[in-house]
């Protein structure tokens, strides 16, 4: 069994210790779930749904906290602090999510929110984020049907309207003249497919299409 870093995993409790419980990580060995996250009544043999990430000493560790983003997902997160290496985002866990300067489209500012993509850095095997989200959108042609309901994340304002990330995978566009409610970056909404262009861009709108017949 191989566990998935930056994702939820169903892992079995193998033993209890004074500072938490250890979970069966298969080929990755035993993984600590610290006491503060151990459910009441938890015992060896129980299977827990936990999120796995690296602690400050780069050790694989488990938590029952719910992060604001998982690996291979997009989200709008706030900058908690900045140092000489990059920015650190609040994603709901004890250890903040790192965005190196090379992955920032513009220099990030503390307290501001940005659309990012979370991924595992190939060189360091750490969970990192990138504000260059266009690099992580699928180049495949979406196979959507007209009027199909999709989940979208509002990405950025353009001269034509708002760019959106569709189903955590594709690029979409809402035209200004078809928007009848206030929108802002980071909003998550239900939308409907109006058209998929030859270049793969999904034209979407928020109002549910009128059904005929």
What are these regions (language model features)?
Residues 29-42, 95-107, 170-182:
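Beta-strand/loop nucleic-acid-binding surfaces
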Residues 1-5, 55-75, 102-104, 130-146, ...:
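Short boundary/loop segments of OB/S1/cold-shock single-stranded nucleic-acid-binding domains
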Residues 1-49, 54-56:
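N-terminal, positively charged regions that mediate nucleic acid binding
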Residues 19-22, 85-88, 160-163, 201:
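Short aromatic-glycine-enriched beta-strand elements
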Residues 11-13, 45-58, 77-81, 112-125, ...:
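Flexible glycine-rich surface loops and low-complexity tracts that mediate binding to linear polymers
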Residues 204-213:
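Single conserved hydrophobic/aromatic residue that forms the stacking wall/gate
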Residues 69-70, 76-141, 155:
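Intrinsically disordered, low-complexity linker/loop segments enriched in Gly/Pro
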Residues 145-201:
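Aromatic-anchored, glycine/proline-accented short structural segments
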């Amino acid at each position: 069994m191989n566990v998935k870093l930056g994702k939820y995993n169903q892992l079995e409790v193998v033993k209890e210790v004074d500072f938490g419980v250890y979970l069966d990580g298969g080929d990755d060995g035993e993984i600590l779930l610290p006491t503060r996250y151990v459910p009441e009544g938890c015992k060896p043999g129980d299977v827990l749904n936990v999120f796995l990430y690296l602690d400050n000493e780069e050790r694989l560790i488990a938590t029952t906290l719910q992060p604001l983003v998982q690996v291979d997902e997009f989200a709008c997160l706030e900058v908690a602090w900045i140092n000489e290496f990059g920015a650190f985002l609040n994603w709901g866990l004890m250890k903040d999510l790192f965005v190196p300067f090379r992955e920032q489209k513009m220099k990030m500012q503390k307290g501001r929110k940005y659309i990012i993509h979370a991924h595992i850095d190939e060189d360091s095997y750490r969970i990192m984020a990138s504000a260059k989200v266009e690099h992580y959108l699928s180049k495949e042609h979406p196979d959507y049907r007209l009027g199909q309901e999709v989940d979208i994340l509002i990405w950025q304002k353009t001269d034509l309207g708002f760019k959106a990330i569709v189903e955590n995978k594709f690029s979409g566009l809402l035209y200004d003249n078809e928007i009848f409610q206030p929108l802002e970056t980071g909003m998550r909404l239900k939308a409907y497919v109006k058209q998929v262009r030859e270049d793969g861009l999904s034209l979407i709108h928020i109002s549910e299409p009128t059904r005929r017949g």
